[in-house]
Amino acid sequence: MKLIFEKGTPGRHCHLLPDCDVPVHQIGVGRKEKLNLPELSENEISRHYTGLAGRAHGVNNGFYPLGSCTMKYNPKVNEEAASLEGFAGIHPLQPEHTVRGALRVFDLAEQYLCEITGMDAMTFQPAAGAHGEFTGLLLIKAYHHSRGDEKRTKIIVPDSAHGTNPASATMAGYSVVSIPSREDGCVDLDKLKEAVGEDTAGLMLTNPNTVGLFDKNILEITRIVHDGGGLCYYDGANLNAVSGIVRPGDMGFDVIHLNLHKTFSTPHGGGGPGSGPVGCKEFLRPFLPGFMVKGPQSIGSVKMFYGNFGVVVKALAYIMTLGREGIPEASSNAVLNANYMMNKLSDLYQMAYNETCMHEFVMTLEDLKHDINVSAMDIAKALLDYGIHPPTMYFPLIVHEALMVEPTETESKETLDEAIEVFRSIYEKAKADPQSLHQAPVKTPVRRLDEVTAARKPVLRYIGE
C-alpha cells in the first residue's frame, strides 16, 4: 500500500475555498523549499484512510490480550455522552456560569473515584499514566519540602515495576533505588527495610503487581515506608483487578494515579487521548494543581486548563452505568477470565508463577527458546495470523522470554476458548516445525519487520525520492 505522499496529482483538490476577504498579513518568514503535501480528492483520501483502518487491529475487531494495558471493550454509549453538544462544544475560557454542567462532571467524577480508591481529593489535569506519576511525585516532593525535609531525595521502586516509574522519579529530580523481588514475584521485605532510610522520599508500587499477583504483605510494606518517614505512591495501572473490592487508600497509600483509559474503559492505544487523574490523602490536598484556585502550596498546573475533559465524561458514564455492584463484578470477571486462560494453558506453556493470578498472568518461554529456539517473539508474531493481538512481550524484565496475557472482563468464554485453542495449536506447531514460526506472521498485510534496524535507524518522516 502506497503512502499518501506517493498518491495524488498536482493541482487536485478536495474543496474550492472562496477568496480570502481579510488582509493578508506578511509574517516575514518564508520556506526555503516548496511544501511537499499530497494533492488528492476527498474520495482518494477517504479510501486511503479506510484502507489503513482495515489493516489496524483494535478491541472492536478482535481479541486484544495486551498485558498490563487493560484493552477492554469501550461502550459506545460513553462516546454518545461525551459527544453531547454541552460537553463537546464548550471552551475552557467560557464564563463559569455557562459551564456548570461540566464542572458538575468533575465534581461527580472526583467523588466516585475517591470512593473507589480511598483517597480524599483528586486532580484531573494529568494527561495519562506517566504524566500522573510525575504529578504524584511532585506532590510528594512538595510535601517533604514544606516540612523542611530536604534530605529525602530517593524513591524506592521494585525491579518488577513499569519502566515509567523510575523514569518519572528521575524527571521529578529523585534518585531511584531498585529493590529485588522475591522468587514469588512479590516485594522482599528484608530488602525494603534495608533500603528505607532518612533519605527515602517514598515508594512506588503497583498492587496487584506487574506479574499479576496481589502482594499479601501490602500493609506491612506501607508501614515500613511510613515508619521511615516516606510516603507511598500507588501506580493504578492494575486497578482493574481490584476496583470496588479493595481500596489503595486502605492499603496505606498516600498518592495514586488512575488510568481512566484502562480501568474505566475510555479508548486508548490510538483510539483517543488518555487521562491520568491523581488522587491523594487530605494532608496532600494543599499541594494539588489548582482547579478553580491555586493555593500557596500548590505545585502549579501540569497541563493547560482542566485536563482531557471528554475522557472524564466517558469514564463518569462508565462508572454510573456499572454502579456500586457492577464495578466489583467487572473486576471479579477480569480475574476469573485470566485464571481460566492460565489454567487451560498451563499444561503446555510454563507459567512464571504457579499461583492464582489476578487480572493477568505471565508465561515464560525460556524452555522453548532453549530447547527448539522458539522465542516469545515467535509465538507473539504467530498469533497475528489468527487475528489475535499479541500479549505484551519481554515484560516484566524479571521474567525471561515473557509473554504477559490480560484478557479483561469484557471477553466471553467463547472468545477465550477460541484464543486458548489458538495458543495450543501454535505450541504444537512450534514443536513439530519450529522453523515455520520464525517466518510468522505470513497472512498479515505487513510481514515481520526488521525491528533492530527500525530501532537503530528510524525513518521518522517522509523524505521522498
Locations of regions flagged by a protein language model:
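Non-catalytic terminal extensions of PLP-dependent enzymes
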Residues: 1-121, 246, 301-302, 319-465
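Mobile "lid/hinge" segments at catalytic clefts and subdomain interfaces of large enzymes
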Residues: 273-342
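Active-site lining segments that contact anionic ligands and/or coordinate catalytic metals
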Residues: 119, 152, 199-201, 227-231, ...
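Conserved phosphate/anionic-ligand binding catalytic regions in large, soluble enzymes, centered on
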Residues: 57-77, 125-133, 264-279, 307-311, ...
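Conserved PLP-enzyme active-site core in the AAT-like
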Residues: 101-104, 131-297, 373-374, 401
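Long, K/E/R/D-enriched contiguous segments that form extended
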Residues: 107-111, 117-120, 125-136, 140
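General small-molecule cofactor/ligand-binding pocket signal
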Residues: 123, 177-179, 391
